[in-house]
Amino acid sequence: MALPITDDDLDGLKQPYVTFSSGSASPPQSTTDAMDLEEQVLDAIKSDAFLVDWVGEDDKGNPQNLPYWRKWVITMSLALYALSTTFSSSVFGAATHVLAEEFALPAETVVLGCTSLFMVGFATGPIFWGPFSEAFGRTRPLLAGYLAFAVLQLPIADARSLTSICILRFLGGFFGAAPSSILSGILADIWSPRERGFAMPTVGAFLTIGPILGPLIGSVLVQSVLGWRWIANVVAIASFFIAVFTFPFLPETYTPLLLARRAERMRHMTRNWAYRSKSEEAQSSIGDFAERYLLRPARMLALEPILLMMTLYVSVSFGLLYNFFLAYPTSFIQERGWDQTTASLPLISILVGVIIAGALLSFTTNSRWAPNAKEGRPQETRLLLMMVGAVSLPAGMFLFAWTSSATMNPWPQILSGIPTGFGIHLINMQGMNYIIDSYKIYANSAIAANTFLRSLFAAGFPILATSMYAAIGVKWGTTILALLAVAMIPIPILFYYFGAKIRAKSKWQPPL
């Protein structure tokens, strides 16, 4: 029969071994008894009795139990980080022709250096920021990345060559990717799955609103007495302002790190070194890192039809969004003769479409348009709204293309941005949500692959658009891209009917 293990027994293991002389008053225990006791102590240590976890559902240390107002402060802080970094991704597009004249370079080269390289950095950043957020918690990588992003804006304002701007823009994208890489983890830390249905569309809307505001505000700055260099200064000032007023309200939310800190406190308070958290038991190697953050996302993207096709569709729609940041100014300046600031105002219609789509997603969170296993609605239910967006996007693009003539009233072309923005946001959000629903515990790997490809498309489309619009004009260039959007329509329809069967055959299908 096993002897009961007490803290005194565990404390005994911390003491040095005691040797007995021939004159000892009492003889030592036999070697067998000592070994049996040690085995019992070790078994007790290995048991869950000393495993530190949350104490009940109401544990105040659990980020899920933060006050409701505090959760929304955190959520809106993340939305502001996303807004400022994605704003920076597109804002220099407004200075393309000014920079081309100042540095005597082709417009395509300026687009490559100022917009595309930023998005390449934005694509590579998550490879590092994701692991950092799991190794060091959420707040430290978030703070480090965001502040570095803000600081890197300052030398851009004094840059004397496009090469310097290119390097700084790439680094700005790399560090600016930190909030976008970490925010989904923080939202999962503090919100329940049902509550995330309201929080995620809010942050997602800011991720799309940011790049839309970039050309609008950038055009105003470029045309003002401040000039293009103040674009970087404005981004820096806004980012520092956001950081100062939000970081004091951001607690650490990563559960493994919080439990490890609690276990450390308990060890020091009780002098019982058996207390530990699950994360402290895990041993990670470079091979584990490569598998989790590099190899698995690549394999999933190559072997998973759902991930591959959904990522392709989301990436195309995201690339089309960045394409319009050039299409609108090109059409309204070159074909209608508007000045740059006025020509950027029609982009507001895309913003309106995004806001309408975001509101629709929030209002339908608990409706028949959303998945609900208890009511028999599978993950594929999300694709219903995605189908609506799939039709809306090319419809808006065709309207934009075929009303772009200077002889036609500009309002149809201006208002075409509403169905365009509406469609882009529905495709992006519902596509991402469907990926998360489909892979659950492997969602981080799936989203990493998605983010990488999506950012590369956003980097490539502006270069493509610059050359294409110069060669064949806005009407036919946008028509070709609209046909590409039409070709994507069958994707959500296909997975709506066959997605469940495809998921059942997946190697990465999570257990029920």
Curated annotation (Swiss-Prot):
CDD domains per record: MFS_Tpo1_MDR_like
Top-level division of the source organism's lineage: Eukaryota
Location (main, coarse): membrane
Any one of the GO CC terms: plasma membrane
Membrane topology label: Multi-pass membrane protein
Keyword Glycosyltransferase: no
Pfam families: MFS_1
Sequence intervals crossing the membrane: 72-92, 110-130, 142-162, 170-190, 202-222, 230-250, 306-326, 343-363, 383-403, 407-427, 456-476, 480-500
Function: MFS transporter; part of the gene cluster that mediates the biosynthesis of cercosporin, a light-activated, non-host-selective toxin. The perylenequinone chromophore of cercosporin absorbs light energy to attain an electronically-activated triplet state and produces active oxygen species such as the hydroxyl radical, superoxide, hydrogen peroxide or singlet oxygen upon reaction with oxygen molecules. These reactive oxygen species cause damage to various cellular components including lipids, proteins and nucleic acids.
Protein name: Cercosporin MFS transporter CTB4
Classification of source organism: Eukaryota, Fungi, Dikarya, Ascomycota, Pezizomycotina
